[in-house]
A protein has these predicted regions:
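Conserved beta-strand hairpin/beta-sheet module of binuclear metal-dependent hydrolase folds
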Residues: 38-87, 222-234
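Divalent metal-coordination and catalytic microenvironments
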Residues: 43, 63, 73, 88, ...
Length: 346
């Protein structure tokens, strides 16, 4: 009996030092109510936002370089980021030492604070400047607006009759709930390392290539490329089955950036929002930018006024995409304004 007890104790002791994915197989990944982990390659995981009320909002990533652990875009909520940190440590067997911000937007960066000061945070100079300039101002504004917005979305969700619409509205409820829940603990945590040129971080298992892409979705974006795995984490340069948010970048430059990234022919392209995509997903977004740009320009040539352009129906191929509220913003407040400003300049 004593021998059996010693054997059992030895087994339990050894299990403490084996990462959970080796115990249960790669299909048994850690769970979070805020996101769903998807294994993309050995040691590479996408953390895809859970639309059913999760607090992640954007998609993130975990990359095991072999001798260090990297997190990409640690969400809008410190609560969701804590799950990501815990799961990264479980899956790789070590603490997180690097965090990558693909751009400045709060849904990709407010989780930074969970990893500070133990991990270095890498982003572009503009990401750092934007966070330093806007963080506290945005938080103070949202303390007033988010509770009202949450009530509005809850009301619209109750009134909705279409199931897909209800699902999307529930996602937006989660967005505002995540903000409200995080207000008491938020602290500004911008990147402490900024890069303006390609940076390769070499690990014992794989390298990760960080590529600043200039103006696109924002005034400075970057992608995280794993050449050995043919995987790219694209941040909000890529939306899949979602209307992209256009509001701080430039559609022509965005399109050129996507065309360059498509030349890499990634087998897997992780978007900032939506399900995991591939090279074809990049081409779909290029076509979206072209379609909306041409549509708005054609209406301007006809003399259609701004209000009428904002009422243009969503093209058939994009009718089932989520983030439908961005469509009106994209056509009216972004593409229209850019086109008319260019015409006036010419």
């Amino acid at each position: 009996m004593q021998t059996k007890s010693l054997k059992l104790s030895s087994i339990l002791f050894l299990l403490l030092f084996i990462p959970i994915n080796y115990l249960f197989g790669q299909s048994e990944l850690p769970k979070s109510k805020h996101y769903n982990l998807e294994k993309l390659a050995d040691g590479v995981y996408a953390a895809i936002h859970n639309d059913d009320g999760g607090f992640a909002i954007c998609n993130g990533g975990i990359v095991n370089l072999g001798d260090r652990t990297v997190i990409i875009d640690p969400f809008i909520s410190p609560t969701a980021a804590r799950d990501l940190k815990k799961h990264a440590e479980i899956l790789t067997g070590r603490p997180v030492s690097l965090v990558i911000n693909t751009h400045c937007h709060d849904d990709h960066t407010r989780g930074n604070q969970v990893f500070d000061p133990d991990a270095n945070i890498i982003g572009t100079p503009d990401a750092r400047r934007s966070i330093e300039r806007d963080f506290y101002k945005a938080v103070e504004s949202e303390k007033e607006s988010s509770p009202k917005e949450l009530l509005n979305f809850q009301k619209w969700m109750e009134q909705a009759t279409d199931e897909e619409e209800k699902k999307e509205l529930k996602m937006w409820c989660g967005y505002h709930q995540a903000k409200i829940e995080s207000f008491p603990e938020l602290k500004m945590t911008p990147p402490n390392i900024t890069i303006t040129d390609t940076m390769t971080i070499w690990g014992t298992k794989r390298e990760i290539v960080l590529i600043p892409t200039g103006i696109g979705h924002t005034t400075e974006d970057l992608i995280a490329y794993l050449p050995a795995d043919s995987i790219i984490f694209m941040g909000d340069l890529l939306f899949v089955e979602r209307h992209p948010f256009m509001g701080g970048g430039d559609p022509a430059s965005w399109k050129k950036t996507l065309q360059k990234i498509a030349l890499l022919k990634p087998k897997i392209a992780v978007p900032g929002h939506g399900p995991v995509g591939d090279t074809n997903s990049i081409h779909v977004l290029i076509k979206y930018i072209d379609t909306l740009t041409e549509m708005v320009n054609e209406e301007i040539k006809k003399g259609t006024n701004k209000d009428k352009i904002s009422e243009l129906p969503v093209p058939e191929e994009y009718k089932n995409w989520w983030f439908s509220g961005f469509y009106k913003w994209n056509t009216l407040n972004f593409l229209y304004n850019i086109a008319t400003a260019k015409a006036n300049k010419d």
